[in-house]
Amino acid sequence: MQGGGVIVDSGNFDWEASGKFPDFTQPDESYHGVVYTREFGKMAYIIKARMQLMRDFGCYPSAHSAFLLNLGLETLPIRMKQYCENATAVAKFLETSDKIVSVTYPGLETDQYHALAQKYLPNGTCGVISFSIKGGRPAAVRFMDALELASIEVHVADIRTCVLHPASATHRQLTEEQLVAAGIDGGLIRLSVGLEHVDDILADVKQALDRV
């Protein structure tokens, strides 16, 4: 078994000298205009690799993690079918709630991308739903705190139902103006529907909404 490579940075390269590395010497707007060479000096390269590149491209798994991932791929078609069925049922329920402002899920006929989803994903779309709850950030926090089955997690596609508040988690580094530009309001919630019985998931979502 071979590794995919290792980053070793001595910290001795001058990224500013030639003017050929603007990614290090110019502001990074995704992190409030930070200039890596100015803020981190000799650690500019390794910090950028950690903060930006890993964020954009994902982490690098160990050999054992890759082995486990490969095992999981063997049952992926079966799991995806259930993910999609559960998510569709939850999305349809959310769409009928008077406490929800909007629901984004390509499996819904009302979604702007439904036709494309039917064309390219005829066997099901995905297990991730985003919806905006009335009352903004305070209501979103109350809803998430009231969930009993779902877990607050940053990842998706778990066998467990997971929920996340993007504005205070994955996109917390953005300003209010940037959040608006990205279509992320304070009431937006991301729900990754799991493989629990759909009735249990629906019951949990309903009781949490009732407590908002």
Predicted regions and their residues:
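Active-site C-terminal subdomain of aminotransferase-like
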Residues: 1-128, 132-162, 167
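PLP-dependent enzyme catalytic core of the Aspartate aminotransferase-like
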Residues: 79, 145, 161-212
